């Protein structure tokens, strides 16, 4: 299998941006390879080497997690970066509109973490609504989710460690099993780390993989990827309308979104198949 040299990995080189899954078309490597991809903060270190036809950049993380300098430079003086790469991959549609050399791809961690353990399936639904929220508070998006979890904690089953809630899954690893917090539920409140066009993560697709309807705050363009009859956009007071009857009325959309997730590639396979191979 082909190998691609990566720089600045925000994930383990043995796997991919999607938990412990691996790309279908190539393996990542830290050793010298013909194809090179500079990721997130390393995009600037790539400016010190000459452009070639197999040299790419990838903004893998969200706007907050990836260095702001990369995005700010693209908005102010895009040639400073683009002149050194064949293409730059990102989920940020605002950046994609700047230049044809900036190619949209899924964000890192776009597929369900559960895919590393088992396939998508419609699980038995015995509970109404959950929410997963970690105690992380180092970004505006984290703090917004924490605040909303505090407001909603008496109206749903809260998991993730925030506000004294249970952390689902075994151990202390980065990719804990969320089954306890997702599988038995009809609905789950999902707040992404940020809200901008093109950005969604496993927080959303974890729900679709187990037949859960997300109560969603995140990508304004999410209808371009999923059936909106199987998504409820978060609004104040929306939890009061959640019932088993409502869930059952959306079964077709639930199954449709599950199939869409089953057929969705990880970010790496998407940009490799469309722009590199």
List where the protein language model places each region:
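Pol beta-like nucleotidyltransferase catalytic core
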Residues: 1-59, 63-158, 162-277
């Amino acid at each position: 299998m082909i190998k691609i040299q990566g720089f600045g990995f925000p994930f383990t080189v043995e796997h991919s941006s999607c938990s412990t899954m691996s790309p279908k078309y190539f393996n990542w490597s830290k050793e010298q390879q013909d194809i090179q991809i500079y990721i997130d903060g390393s995009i600037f270190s790539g400016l010190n080497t000459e452009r070639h036809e197999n040299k790419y950049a990838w903004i893998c993380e969200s706007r907050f997690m990836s260095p702001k300098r990369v995005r700010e430079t693209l908005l102010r003086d895009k040639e400073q970066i683009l002149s050194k790469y064949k293409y730059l991959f990102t989920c940020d549609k605002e950046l994609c509109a700047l230049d044809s050399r900036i190619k949209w791809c899924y964000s890192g961690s776009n597929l369900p973490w559960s895919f590393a353990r088992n396939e998508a399936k419609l699980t038995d639904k015995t509970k109404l609504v959950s929410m997963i929220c970690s105690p992380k508070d180092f970004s505006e998006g984290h703090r917004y989710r924490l605040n909303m979890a505090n407001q909603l904690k008496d109206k749903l089953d809260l998991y993730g460690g925030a506000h004294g809630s249970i952390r689902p899954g075994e151990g202390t690893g980065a990719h804990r099993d969320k089954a306890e917090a997702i599988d038995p539920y009809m609905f789950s409140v999902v707040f992404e780390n940020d809200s901008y066009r093109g950005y969604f993560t496993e927080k959303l697709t974890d729900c679709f993989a187990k037949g859960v309807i997300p109560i969603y705050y995140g990508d304004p363009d999410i209808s371009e990827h999923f059936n909106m009859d199987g998504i409820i956009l978060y609004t104040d007071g929306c939890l009061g309308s959640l019932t088993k009857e409502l869930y059952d009325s959306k079964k077709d959309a639930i199954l449709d979104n599950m199939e869409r997730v089953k057929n969705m590639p990880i970010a790496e396979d998407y940009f490799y198949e469309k722009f590199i191979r």
